[in-house]
A protein has these predicted regions:
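Non-heme di-metal
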Residues: 1-261
């Protein structure tokens, strides 16, 4: 029997909160002023390498919504697509503003090696949006974007630190201002779509797996920022034990339990 929309969203938040954005060393280090300006620029090169794939995976979500005749989802998909890619400047263009201020050209950024975490994130996000339904693609992004946006969200706090402590110009840090303004709406609309459309057992399971994929993928991306800054292959473990549904051996199917004992 499917969960109620409220109970299902609450369950999905428990997945996202295993690796909360605000606690990841990339964001926390900026907010608490533990990284140097030079390290942040190296991390932002990795950010750029992932963001330049936005048109690819948003395109897959849009195409899937049309091919699936998911008319109710199309408005959400197109709103997000236009905010990300429409207008005179895309998010990729805005990302480049910080790199340009640091003396890094687009050609130099394009030639940079992706860190292990960055590579994993790109493959997981692009592949996930290509091979899964439009609803699953939105779910993959939703709980990360919802944490990013808003006046008290991660992006707003990072923006204040970049401007106030590190001395980046508003133009250089603009990508975080835009995330603060737009991502709360993106995430909220996507979560509302999950409430509306994920109403069967099978759809809820697909969305559950997509959210897990997205949470892991973006966590890998931020690991990639830190890997590029430090030169160390490290993976952030999150704030608690890894919760996985695993067989119990009692013949009753999988149950949710910690992987650590």
């Amino acid at each position: 029997m499917p969960l109620s929309p409220d109970d299902f969203i609450a369950e999905l938040w428990t997945i996202a909160r295993q690796v909360p954005m605000i606690e990841h060393p990339w964001f926390k280090g900026i907010i608490e002023h533990r990284w140097t300006r030079e390290q942040i620029v190296l991390g932002e090169v990795q950010h750029y390498l992932r963001v330049r794939t936005n048109p690819i995976f948003f395109g897959y979500i849009a195409v899937n919504a049309v091919s699936e005749k998911q008319y109710g989802l199309m408005e959400v998909v197109l709103d997000n697509f236009m905010e990300e890619l429409g207008g005179e400047r895309t998010h990729v263009d805005i990302m480049l503003q910080m790199l340009e201020e640091a003396g890094i050209s687009r050609a130099e950024a394009d030639a940079a090696d992706a860190a292990p975490g960055t590579t994993a994130a790109i493959e997981m996000i692009v592949g996930g949006c290509q091979r899964r339904s439009a609803l699953e693609g939105l779910a993959l992004l939703s709980f990360v974007e919802d944490q990013h946006g808003g006046a008290s969200g991660v992006a707003a706090q990072v923006y204040r630190s970049l401007i106030g402590h590190y001395g980046f110009s508003p133009r250089a840090a603009e990508t975080y201002q835009i995330h603060a303004e737009q991502d709360e709406g993106h995430g909220g609309r996507q979560i509302d779509a999950i409430r509306r459309f994920a109403v069967t057992d099978s759809l809820q399971e697909k969305v559950r797996q997509a959210v897990q994929l997205g949470v892991n993928a973006f966590n890998f991306e931020w690991d990639g920022h830190v890997q590029a800054m430090t030169g160390v292959r490290e993976h952030w473990a999150g704030v608690g034990a890894l919760a996985l549904r695993q067989p119990t051996g009692a013949g009753h199917g999988p149950s949710l339990r910690s992987a650590k004992t």
